[in-house]
């Protein structure tokens, strides 16, 4: 699957564990990179729902059209589907603390 990034910092963090660790902290940065590996290895968006460990789920309200997958604890990787073979990484956040 092709991945687009909402920001250059998110793109840089996807290339380097050092960058990911500086941006998110090491445990979250490591999971971020692992999730990108899964996304790149997946052919179609709908296949992501078969990966139970991702806990991919749609968001509601102002985030309608966006999806979240678990990184660690309350931290989620927020994505949106662009096409069946293309996603955009929007953010990594603890949206439960809002």
For the regions a language model picked out, list residue spans one by one.
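Arg/Lys-rich, positively charged N-terminal/basic patches that mediate binding to nucleic acids
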Residues: 1-36
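Residues that recognize and position ribonucleotide moieties
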Residues: 3-4, 52, 85
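Hydrophobic residues in alpha-helical segments
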Residues: 14, 40-43
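Generic alpha-helix structural propensity
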Residues: 31-34, 40, 51-54
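A short, surface-exposed loop/turn module that caps and links secondary-structure elements
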Residues: 43-67
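Enriched for short, Lys/Arg-rich terminal
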Residues: 66-98
């Amino acid at each position: 699957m092709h991945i687009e990034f909402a920001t250059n910092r998110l793109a840089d963090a996807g290339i380097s564990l050092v960058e990911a660790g500086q941006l998110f902290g090491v445990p979250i940065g490591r999971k971020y990179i692992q999730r990108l590996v899964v996304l790149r290895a997946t052919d179609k968006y709908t296949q992501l729902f078969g990966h139970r460990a991702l806990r991919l789920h749609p968001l509601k309200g102002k985030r309608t059209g966006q999806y979240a997958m678990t990184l660690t604890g309350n931290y989620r990787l927020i994505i949106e589907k662009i096409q069946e073979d293309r996603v955009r990484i929007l953010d990594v956040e603890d949206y439960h603390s809002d």
